Amino acid sequence: MNDLITIVVPVYNVEKYLPHTLESICGQTYTNLQILLIDDGSTDDSLAVCHKWARQDNRIQVYEQENQGVSRTRNKGIQLAIGKYVMFLDADDWVEADMLESLYRLAEADHADVACCLLREENQLEETDNCTTTERTIIHGKNKTESGLALLTVWGPVCKLYRKDLIENIQFEEYKVAEDLLFNTNVVCSEKFERASLIQYPFYHYMIYAGSAMKQEFQDKYLEAMRVEELCYEKLTKISPEFADINLIGCSVSRVFEKYAALSPEKKKQYKAEFKYCKKFAREHKNALLQTKDRHRKISGWLKVYIPDFYLWTLSRRMRG
């Protein structure tokens, strides 16, 4: 008999999108599921949607709590999980019908601690497609470093099937952003973690709506993301310098530059101190920005470190068209 898989779905004010998400879960070809819907103090009808679906499918268990944030909600899901494997799913995303079956069979065949796949971003505000592959090639991690790189192909906890005994003592920490990257960093750094395998196919559909957390205008939390990504970089490169190729520092600095460049002149004045901090951060991490095999990244890193205001000007001009 196939092992039980637990799906953890934090729910918060997603009544509009939740039915499509649940339809994709309940319609999986892999059917031995524990589906945990944890309502985090929603103020819309999300909880009613959860209960409606629970009445239709006895695999669904609904839990309610006062608003505590996504990290505590996911942690509660780990505590409640009784499956051999655990998967996290955001309540406004959806997954293809054979995702769980494909990841489960890969995990079992490879004796993998984590089986992963890619994701496809679907932007409801504009036409985008960040992943065009239709093949299902597989990367089998042969050691901890290869496995860690495979796991971190997608930084977040979604599109992954974790062994429950691997993550049962690993917590999502309470940051506003990048807490999911830190969780996976701690998974990779765990003594229990040995192997991950990756199907290079986007079974997971990541939906981008107006107001999505990392698609908003410049906010202070982007500086917090820089500090969290710095912590992850330090932890991972202690295991192997190969983790520098993930470009954690480069991505975090680039995000702030791009968000700041998109601001109006008045808004730029408002966030001048934050951008000054970002430039200082880039100088302090110049080795991480410049030690890359990718020529484009190296040039971009050099510009951010040595002539950041010129680089900002070119970004702003490009955004204005």
Predicted ranges, named:
Residues 234, 263-321:
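Membrane-interface aromatic/basic loop that binds lipid-linked glycans or pyrophosphate carriers
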Residues 24, 39-48:
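A conserved acidic beta->alpha catalytic loop
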Residues 143-219, 224:
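Conserved nucleotide-sugar donor-binding catalytic segment
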Residues 86:
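Short aromatic/hydrophobic "clamp" motif used to bind/position activated sugar donors
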Residues 202-209, 215-246, 250, 254-285:
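Catalytic core of nucleotide-sugar-dependent glycosyltransferases
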Residues 13-27:
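Short, well-formed alpha-helical segments that are part of the catalytic scaffolds
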Residues 65-81:
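Glycine-rich, basic loop-to-helix element that forms the pyrophosphate-binding segment
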Residues 99-174:
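Flexible acidic/His/Gly-enriched loops in nucleotide-sugar-dependent glycosyltransferase catalytic domains
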